[in-house]
């Protein structure tokens, strides 16, 4: 196997000031041949502030639009860390499907290191009729 080309979906714009990383990407090719990616941005791999972002490419992934949050929902009672993937249906509806771990606070890990229990999670779905 050899690497033909390297594509960067997300780079932290302020790495000296803010710790952010992009993880768990999913990419679909839309009907107009553009690419759409959903991925998660957060402070750390297991951080409670993980949110799903969307970005598009019109040049086969060589460059990407500035990431935008998939939604603007504000969690009032308990925070959720989420990850969703795109799925293009035959009728050209675009789904974002995934899950969100319910976080009792920002410092509780997803997996309890003593009991190995996993935090509860909620299934998530979002539907787009306009290619995201």
What residue ranges belong to the model's regions?
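Asp-box/BNR beta-propeller blade signature and adjacent active/binding-site loops
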Residues: 1-132
């Amino acid at each position: 196997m050899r690497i033909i080309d390297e594509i960067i979906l997300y780079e932290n714009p302020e790495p000296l000031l803010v710790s952010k990383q992009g993880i768990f990407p999913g990419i679909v090719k839309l009907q107009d041949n553009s690419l759409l990616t959903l991925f998660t941005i957060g402070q750390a791999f297991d951080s409670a502030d993980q949110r799903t972002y969307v970005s598009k490419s019109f040049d086969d992934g060589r460059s990407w639009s500035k990431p935008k949050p998939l939604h603007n929902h504000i969690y009032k009672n308990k925070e959720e860390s989420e990850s969703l993937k795109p799925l293009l249906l035959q009728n050209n509806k675009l789904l974002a499907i995934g899950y969100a771990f319910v976080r009792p606070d920002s410092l509780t890990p997803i997996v309890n290191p003593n009991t190995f229990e996993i935090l509860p999670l909620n299934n998530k779905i979002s539907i787009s009729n306009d290619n995201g």
